[in-house]
């Protein structure tokens, strides 16, 4: 059985499209993809290597829901790391990291780097949980500090090849965000 990458997507259609695009990157790298939302009734899953939570921050309720899902994934996927991205990750990095040691954060401004994570996982198959989260976070921090990389990624990097998990496709025209969160 191949390792599973699980996605939870909150918020707008853009997040849904970008989660599909990131899922395509992982699928093309040989990982199995799960996009069915977890609930309290979901059984523990030891095959999940990484959970990706694409967040929203339009309301305080959206942030609360993101924190609840992050905690749920930490409990239901004990071997996995949890990668949090999106608007909430952009605005509240330290708050999210304080939830647990198996968490890494990729701000929404750098979300295009999700496409780099499959290669990180392939090159480091021995890493799980806390060690994997720390390694991914360190990789992101290197990207943030590299001249020329500390910029918004090409806006269409996470456009999916196909829409395997939705019945309708979306056409991305723009992000609609100038990435100057305060």
Where do the protein language model's features map onto the residues?
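Proteins enriched for Cys/Gly/acidic motifs involved in redox and nucleic-acid/cofactor modification
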Residues: 1-182
């Amino acid at each position: 059985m191949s390792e599973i990458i699980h996605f939870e997507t909150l918020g707008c259609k853009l997040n849904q499209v970008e989660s599909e695009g990131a899922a395509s990157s992982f699928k093309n790298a040989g990982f199995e993809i799960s996009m069915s939302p977890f609930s309290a009734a979901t059984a523990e899953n030891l095959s999940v290597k990484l959970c990706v939570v694409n967040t929203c921050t339009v309301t305080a309720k959206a942030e609360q829901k993101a924190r609840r899902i992050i905690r749920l994934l930490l409990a239901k996927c004990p071997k996995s790391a949890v990668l949090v991205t999106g608007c909430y990750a952009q605005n509240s990095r330290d708050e999210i990291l304080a939830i647990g040691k198996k968490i890494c954060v990729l701000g929404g401004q750098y979300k295009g780097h999700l496409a780099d994570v499959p290669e990180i996982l392939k090159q480091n198959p021995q890493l799980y949980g806390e060690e994997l989260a720390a390694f991914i976070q360190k990789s992101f921090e290197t990207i943030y500090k590299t001249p020329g990389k500390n910029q918004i990624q090409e806006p269409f990097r996470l456009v999916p090849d196909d829409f395997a998990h939705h019945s309708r496709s979306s056409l991305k025209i723009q992000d609609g965000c100038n990435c100057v969160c305060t």
